[in-house]
Design a protein with these regions (language model features):
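Extended alpha-helical interaction modules
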Residues: 21, 32-183, 187
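Elongated alpha-helical scaffolds
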Residues: 24-26
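Membrane-associated alpha-helical segments
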Residues: 184-310
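Conserved helix-loop functional segments at active or binding sites
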Residues: 162, 166-169, 195, 209, ...
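Cytosol-facing regions at membranes
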Residues: 64-67, 209, 238, 245, ...
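Alpha-helical transmembrane anchor segments
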Residues: 288-342
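General N-terminal leader/first-domain-start detector
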Residues: 1-15
Length: 342
């Protein structure tokens, strides 16, 4: 019985070794079927395995068939390749052929010609070929995401240009609305960053594995044919570079949005400081006016008090004159006026 919780396992299917491996993002199945050296036909999947895979056909990332043959009596055209690529691998101990044309069921075919490899080295070399194709397909999954994101980035760039022009126009009365628009754009950019970061990171990791496995093949030319590694790199590197460029574009956009927000925040802060300074100046002017008014009121109060005192003394001296003291009110007021005024 299969242990479904294990990371990998080996069993037998129709009497043939059947290996399965669980990876982080995908699941691999490897079936080894012996065949005679004279057989030039590509083997079909056993019915049991084909029926098991059929319901999951839409989720199949990559299907590769490797046919192993000896170099003696090789007739390459019999294997149905059209303009194949070929490479000597393992320091010339084996030759690999493929035209990278998918069959009707989506299978990519490799013809592996073993010259001087033992079983262990042959297995390692075939495994590298399988990993190259698997990792290449896994890395290419991000291309659809990158294309969709690129269209969104075009719209975000236009929005950022519009907001930058509004900010440069000095529309101080609309600073709040401008800040809200920048915050909304920032949220959208951050959302796209969070959603795509894992996928872009996976693409870089898978691409690095592809190039490492290609280097481990130690390829050399077979006649005038294009090497497998050259064929793969010419078609795979643009995908990797496009994804990397899209990721960098997203990161740069996030920085530009953040910088615009910081600049606007600084401008709003300066405007608020200027408003506060104006309010303080207004308060100081009002305080000065109140001090002047208070001084004027105090001066008027002194005049009024002096006037009342003089009238009071006038009545007093008038009464004393009536009593016969010989001091008229006028003389008394003249004598008292200086100290009263002081």
């Amino acid at each position: 019985a299969l242990d479904t919780t294990a990371a990998q396992g080996i069993t037998r299917l129709d009497g043939h070794p059947f290996k399965w491996e669980r990876h982080t993002e995908f699941f691999t199945l490897t079936l080894v079927v012996p065949c005679t050296a004279a057989d030039t036909d590509w083997q079909a999947l056993p019915p049991v395995l084909a029926e098991a895979i059929a319901p999951q056909a839409a989720q199949v990332i990559n299907a590769v068939q490797v046919l192993v043959r000896d170099e003696q009596g090789l007739d390459l055209p019999q294997y149905g390749f059209k303009d194949p690529c070929g490479s000597c691998v393992g320091g010339g101990d084996a030759v690999v052929w493929s035209d990278f044309r998918l069959t009707e069921d989506g299978t990519n075919r490799f013809l592996f010609i073993n010259r001087r490899l033992n079983a262990y080295r042959q297995g390692r070399m075939i495994r590298r070929l399988l990993e190259i194709e698997t990792y290449r397909m896994m890395a290419s999954l991000t291309l659809t995401t990158a294309k969709a994101l690129s269209q969104e980035l075009d719209a975000f760039d236009k929005t950022l240009v519009t907001l930058s022009e509004r900010s440069a126009g000095g529309e101080g009365h609309d600073s709040k609305g401008l800040l809200e628009a920048i915050a909304h754009l920032s949220r959208q950019v951050v959302s796209r960053t969070v959603k795509t970061r894992h996928r872009f990171g996976a693409t870089q990791a898978y691409a690095q594995l592809v190039f490492e496995r290609l280097g481990e093949l130690r390829e050399s030319h077979v006649g005038d044919c294009q090497r497998l590694g050259v064929f793969i790199e010419r078609r795979f590197k643009p995908t990797v570079r496009y994804c990397a460029a899209t990721e960098q574009r997203l990161e740069q956009l996030a920085k530009n949005v953040a910088n615009l927000g910081d600049l606007l925040q600084a401008r709003v802060q300066v405007e608020m400081e200027e408003q506060n300074a104006g309010i303080l100046r207004s308060l100081n002017a009002r305080a000065d006016a109140q001090v002047k008014i208070q001084r004027a009121v105090e001066g008027l109060s002194i005049i009024a008090i002096t006037y009342y005192l003089l009238n009071l003394f006038k009545l007093l001296y008038g009464g004393l004159n009536v009593l016969g003291l010989g001091l008229t009110a006028r003389d008394g007021l003249l004598a008292m006026a200086p100290p009263v005024l002081l």
